[in-house]
């Protein structure tokens, strides 16, 4: 019997970007069995409700009267998916999307081949997919291009490293073991805290190097210090800066 995949997308006041994300999601060669959209601005006649209802697959619209942030939104969507009997939960936000129609099928195949509890695609710059949306540090070296993640010919998996939650695919049993995102973190750092839970669990996970999720570039937040020998994250937006440092201190 084919295992069920529930897609969970969290959105907040970006209906145009959400529409693009859902267009790619519903064009996958392996379609999700159900789509759950958590609307963090779900008061009154939200345009998102109509957008979700018009999708070509089974859907659930969850409108929240309170902005739960990415953390609370994903937690709500994940729990709803689990309650509906999902075997897999595939995550996305409203400002990014899968690179092509084969991403979900590729992630499922990678998880099956390597017996993974969670698998993520590479997260690449939506304006230049050859570059990573967020730099990845390996030792003292920052990797900024997707090609730099492969260290040998034919490599398919980067074990023990995953970007959450952009395109991340979780087994239901994994979420039962490590839990869902912490509502208190709201945004910024919720994915880091959950990544640490995933590491502590000892469950196998990694990044599939044959799949990509496109996301706006976040590299500009990493500012060079000590004449470029190191970098520090410093978001320009004061709200993002607050949650970045508050949550980093907590984690």
Region roles according to the model:
Residues 39-49, 96-97:
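A conserved acidic beta->alpha catalytic loop
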Residues 14-27:
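Short, well-formed alpha-helical segments that are part of the catalytic scaffolds
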Residues 86-95:
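Short beta-strand-to-loop acidic/aromatic patch adjacent to the donor-nucleotide binding site
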Residues 150-170:
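A recurrent flexible, glycine/aromatic-enriched loop bordering the glycosyltransferase active site
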Residues 204-251:
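Active-site-adjacent helix/loop segment of glycosyltransferases
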Residues 101-134:
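Conserved donor NDP-sugar-binding/catalytic core segment of glycosyltransferases
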Residues 64-84:
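Glycine-rich, basic loop-to-helix element that forms the pyrophosphate-binding segment
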Residues 168, 174-179, 184-212:
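A short, conserved alpha-helix in the catalytic core of glycosyltransferases
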